[in-house]
Amino acid sequence: MFDFDTNTSEMFLYDDIGPAWMGMIDASSVMAALKKMPQDAPVTVRINSGGGSVDEAVAIFNALERHPGEVNVAIDSIAASAASYIAMVGKTITIAKGGVMMIHSPWTIAMGNATEMRKTADVLDLYEQRITEAYAARMQGKYSPDEIKQFLADETWFSADEAVEAGLATSVENIIAEPVMIAEGRYAKTPKMFIVRKDAGERTAYPHARNRYRAIANRAKFDKR
């Protein structure tokens, strides 16, 4: 699910990242939503996504980075793979209690001859350099570049507290994350508590708590008055 609210200046990335024709969240949808937002007001991007297309994620990151207003990120349950990269655009990055983040090296499915496959590998290397720089900007002073690259190679999962400790998030939000179940085999090291067995090709279903989080956001705005 992708949605946005111009009244609260919130954007909800509650699905996989990828082509809109496949029912996923694409960069065009995000850019269209940003144009409707107050240009001088802070925007909150609420994430509950297992990731997806790195191409779309880079385009979404760039669109958010170009937005003239301040961009903050709230991880409502999970930000894995490409979604964790998008999260790095936030001036602040909060994560709900029980929420998780995952970072890993980008991968893809490709077909072609040896020359074409080498070109694909080169593109993946470029993407890895780009996302490594984004993570490193947050984790600098805590981990060396080689350690960060190893986190990516190992497919590293972080609890909410671990994400803050690592520098990937700025604070833990005092709400309980809704659990999300990830299809078995989607990632190499998915924590067992998140694994659900699904038929081949079946997509992960994300809990859609839009109204709940919108109410929380409105309450937070009221409390600041």
Which residue stretches match the model-derived regions?
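N-terminal organellar transit peptides
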Residues: 1-82, 89-225
